[in-house]
Amino acid sequence: MSKVWVGGFLCVYGEEPSEECLALPRDTVQKELRSGNIPLPLNINHNEKATIGMVRGLFDLEHGLFCVAQIQSQTFMDIIRNIASKSKLIAAGSVIEPLPPDPEIECLSSSFPGLSLSSKVLQDENLDGKPFFHHVSVCGVGRRPGTIAIFGREISWILDRFSCISESEKRQVLEGVNVYSQGFDENLFSADLYDLLADSLDTSYIRKRFPKLQLDKQLCGLSKCTYIKASEPPVEIIVATGKVAGDQVQLTTEPGSELAVETCDVSVVHGNYDAVESATATTAMSNQNLPNTTPLLSSPPFSDCVFLPKDAFFSLLNVTTGQQPKVVPPVSVHPPVTEQYQMLPYSESAAKIAEQESNRYHSPCQTMYPYWQYSPVPQYPAVLHGYRQPKTFKKRHFQSDSEDELSFPGDPEYTKKRRRHKVDNDDDKEMAREKNDLRELVDMIGMLRQEINALKHVRAQSPQRHVVPMETLPTIEEKGAASPKPSILNASLTPETVNRSLAGQNESMDLLKLNKKLFVDALNKMDS
């Protein structure tokens, strides 16, 4: 078999990482490269027992630090070859025509699409004599932006995938790579397969893995002709034929088969039935191109349902609602009743009241509607009954309104004015309520004084003082002493690193909960 190469950027100079410790300045990279390009091992997920090859070159390009490595472990390649032969998805081949079918390369690209550089911490002064670069790893996703691993059989093919690399830089990489492979010790790959399976399981549950890979692919300017499936939509319709064998259902995919559902152009549709017919025809045409195939989301038999994409469905819904005629409410024959009059039902006494009124004023009572009685809106009670305000109820006049000097809460004059406001108020209920509040406050202060005096008396009589240790939160220095920072920094994204980044947020939330609990306890003690 031919050689398997892997290439990609270990860091991008123009992008800032999410964590400050992951920053890798260009001057630092150039300084370390001038000191001597030491051969670095290539492993899996920073596991030194899972070394699969060697790094053949590190190059300082305009876009970032580029790496070219070779996979030399035959034991590891045998595992990849067996996995690729049993995978139905890989056996179906790539949907992109320019890519040649290569199950091993596709399996490597799907399992380890990220690159990670293990380097020395910049702030650590204890590792001055040791090399800055430690090793390079292939992983599920890298922590630094733009760290995508491209696997291939030739270095030139890998370099052509990156549009951000110029032609002169490609020649520089091809001339600087050490293509002469040296002997590889197979004992370097001694990792347990269960450990690799556990790492793969942990990586699959990283929530931001696929969005991170999509962003990295855009930062590196990778073309669509790659085996990495990070840029493909997360939900894909796989056309397969189901063959039932016993209690198991075997799905056999057909290479090159695709289910293309086209969305109808709603802008040229002038009727609801035309839109539905066009969408139905599009679906029928797409199904005719797939002989002897049954999609996973096929419609049940004897059904009149039409399966449409979400965008087409909402477009049809908008067209349907937009073409409905606007309903105008009918105009009332009678004019609306104003708020000044209240219409009462007809009663027999209405005629008698009209007759009495006409006899009283010696004139006939003329009514516009003799069968209806109108009553005016009740007026304000004070005006209706001739109510007069008492002399004691006057407009409040405070001495502070006429004074030019300002006072603020806490000043003696301010408290006097507030008391004067309360004295001028003649509401007995308000005064009684304030007196009760003051009396309760005085009683509570008296109880607190009694408790303090009792505690002082007990402490004075006790010959020995017992000290109870209290649990306190560790300081930043104590945290640093208890958990020292690692001297080697691994730039692969794992669930452990994600939880570590969230630890600071959890500590601040715990402190906030503690303060809230103390405040609630104090309020409960005052209420009791």
Swiss-Prot record:
SUPFAM superfamilies, alphabetized:
Herpes virus serine proteinase, assemblin
Residue positions of motif Nuclear localization signal: 416-422
**Would the keyword Protease turn up in this protein's UniProt record?**
yes
Q: Which Pfam families match?
A: Peptidase_S21
The record's active-site residues are: H46 (charge relay system), S116 (charge relay system), H135 (charge relay system)
Q: Region labeled Disordered — which residues?
A: 394-432
What cellular component GO annotations does this protein have? Answer: host cell cytoplasm; host cell nucleus
Could you tell me the superkingdom of the organism this chain comes from? Viruses
Per UniProt, the keywords (alphabetical) are: Host cytoplasm, Host nucleus, Hydrolase, Phosphoprotein, Protease, Serine protease, Viral capsid assembly, Viral release from host cell
User: Segment Interaction with major capsid protein: which positions?
Assistant: 508-528
Q: Where is this site: Cleavage?
A: A230, S231, A491, S492
State the top-level EC class: hydrolase
Tell me yes or no: is Electron transport among this UniProt entry's keywords.
Answer: no
Q: What is its EC number?
A: 3.4.21.97
Give one GO molecular function term: identical protein binding
Which terms under GO biological process does the entry name? nuclear capsid assembly; proteolysis; viral release from host cell
- Ranges for the region named Interaction with pAP are 270-288
Report the sequence similarity comment from the record.
Answer: Belongs to the herpesviridae capsid scaffolding protein family.
Regarding domains, what does the record say?
Answer: Region of interaction between pPR and pAP is called Amino conserved domain (ACD). The region of interaction with major capsid protein is called carboxyl conserved domain (CCD).
Protein name, per record: Capsid scaffolding protein
